């Protein structure tokens, strides 16, 4: 996806109250920007390193700037805005990048499903095959050369795995898609050291037929795209 305008840059000072981040602009001014990430952002917060942000012209917004990208001391780029993961996945499916998800007639977003009243991120439908329910997760935690999900305990993520297993039991296709938004991650696995319950459920889901795949994003201040598959350790 090409962004409507190139991101502007600054330097990270601090993230606090989950949704707020202080940065120093390139002109030296200190400002507060919106942080569109509800996770712990473990290993993504590097004070003094470069960050990039988008700017909204919506006058109703309290904070017009939104944090989009972070740079690590090693020079890796991290996509901070988890809300972009679904759009990246949709674009990649429509463009045939995700080979495992080709061949469907229609794509819908945020469709209600499951006994726990969830909304599936992406639903693929075709008259000649079972529906395909796709849950999208953004992976940004890099530790000791591996990418991990989640970066904090996630009861919501556990619920989504149960819903996907339920779809398989009903004869549908279910896929968990990790969108890797960290340029240093080349392999993904469950973070059992952070959320052992999620890791156990992920193994159960895989055993019951939920497909688990990962695709890596190439992100810059101008555009972001999913470009290649990434191995998942189960």
From Swiss-Prot:
**MF GO annotations:** DNA binding
Q: Domain of life, per the record?
A: Bacteria
Q: Which InterPro entries match?
A: SfsA (IPR005224), SfsA_C (IPR040452), SfsA_N (IPR041465)
Membrane-spanning residues: none
Disulfide bond sites: none
* A Pfam family per the record: SfsA
Q: Which family does it belong to?
A: Belongs to the SfsA family.
What the entry lists under NCBIfam families is as follows: sfsA
HAMAP family for the chain: SfsA (MF_00095)
Tell me the protein's name. Answer: Sugar fermentation stimulation protein homolog
Q: Which gene is annotated as encoding this protein in its UniProt record? A: sfsA
């Amino acid at each position: 996806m090409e962004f409507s305008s190139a991101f502007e840059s600054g330097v990270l000072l601090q993230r606090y109250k989950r949704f707020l981040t202080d940065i120093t602009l390139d002109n030296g001014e200190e400002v507060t920007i919106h942080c569109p990430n509800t996770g712990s952002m473990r290993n993504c917060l590097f004070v003094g390193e470069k960050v990039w942000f988008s700017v909204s012209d919506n006058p109703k917004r309290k904070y017009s700037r939104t944090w989009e990208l972070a740079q690590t001391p090693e020079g890796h780029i991290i996509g901070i805005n988890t809300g972009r993961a679904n759009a990246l996945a949709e674009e990649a499916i429509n463009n045939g990048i995700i080979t495992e998800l080709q061949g469907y007639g229609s794509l819908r977003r945020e469709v209600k499903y499951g006994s726990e009243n969830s909304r599936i991120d992406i639903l693929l439908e075709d008259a000649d095959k079972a529906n395909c329910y796709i849950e999208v997760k953004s992976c940004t935690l890099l530790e000791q050369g591996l990418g991990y999900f989640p970066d904090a305990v996630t009861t919501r993520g556990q619920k989504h795995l149960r819903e996907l297993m339920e779809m398989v039991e009903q004869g549908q296709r279910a896929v968990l898609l990790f969108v890797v938004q960290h340029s240093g991650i080349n392999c993904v696995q469950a973070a059992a050291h952070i959320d052992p319950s999620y890791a156990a459920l992920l193994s159960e889901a895989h055993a019951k037929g939920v497909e688990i795949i990962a695709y890596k994003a190439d992100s810059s201040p101008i555009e972001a795209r999913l470009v290649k598959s990434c191995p998942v350790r189960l």
